[in-house]
Amino acid sequence: MIIGLFPELEPAGGIQRVGRHLAAVITEFAESRKMECRLLSLNDSPELHRMSVGDREFVFTGSARAKGRFTATALRSARRHAKLVIAAHPYLAPVAQGMRIAAPRMKSIVVAHGIEIWEPLSTLRRRALRRSNVILTPTQDTANHVATQQQIPRDRIRVLPWALDPDFENLAVATAQSSLPLNYPAGRVILTVGRWQSNERYKGMDTLITALPRLLHEWPDLQLVAVGDGDDRDWLEQMAKSSGVQGHVHFYTGLTSVELAACYSACEIFALPSRGEGFGLVYLEAMARGKPVIGGAHGGAPEVIDDGKTGYLVQHGDVPQLATSIETLLSDPALEREMGARGRERVNREYKFGVFAKSLKKILRELCES
């Protein structure tokens, strides 16, 4: 048996999307070896769920945030001759290690995403992480933090870049005006996508708003479109009003996948000048649509964005540098197209779901056969 442990799988979000990718590949791998597969989610509602990633279906059971129920189900599953457990977040590492009491020969993988391991974990979580056979990370930057902050031997850390979602990839090219959300602005558009939470201001949405007055002097039809919601939206809207650019900042929430794809297609530049991205799946989505991307010169973003070739990297909070990067692109449409084309080529070469699935299956095979 192979067991997968997940924080949650149904909601939107980068960690959730990676979880779905993992679940789909784990299921496919188990089926190919005629092994039983059990996928458990801590936060999702307590019934059997069915989801898919592209044409790969998987089922999982939720626990409605009941940690006791989740842990008990995991322990019972481990007793059924489990060979491998994959914990899709470091916070679930203690559950995975507890399962090894019931199945001492079972191997374990823990997935680290980024900012959650940039500081030392609690003693319990760090000890469980150290006892794992393999720690998967999406970038070398995250791998370095796992090694230094959590004191994990480097030979147990494997870098596995995340992938473009095949459902996004398979969408029909959504460029028609009718596919855009209602009241989408006319003009040249900078797009940003994220969660606008007060505890996640590292995303850099505020610096985009601060840069707008300078940019509007040269391009008065410029618009900033922000897809996502959060408790910081009121603060950001007030910032736009105080800066006199409220008519150029537009928030959209609850978009369909087709509407989101249309937003990527309709924008001229994608920007998320964050200092806390462990990877940045939204960069892949923009690159797949042939758009130049601007990200923070921090975390895992420099491993996704080729500075000066597929976009630009800027220091978090450096508004003049951010504005200059945007100006360079807006003033040179040929450069925009060139960078966008390079980004699309890189996604097609390195970040397709098939590449991710093949690499993950190789790791699963090694552990199952060792």
Functional labels for PLM-detected ranges:
Residues P292-G295, I305:
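Short hydrophobic beta-strand element within catalytic cores of glycosyltransferases
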Residues L129, G254-L255, A262-C267:
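Short alpha-helical donor nucleotide-sugar binding micro-motif in glycosyltransferases
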Residues D141, A163:
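Carbohydrate-associated surface elements
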Residues N183-K203, I209-L212:
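Conserved donor-binding/catalytic core segment of Leloir-type glycosyltransferases
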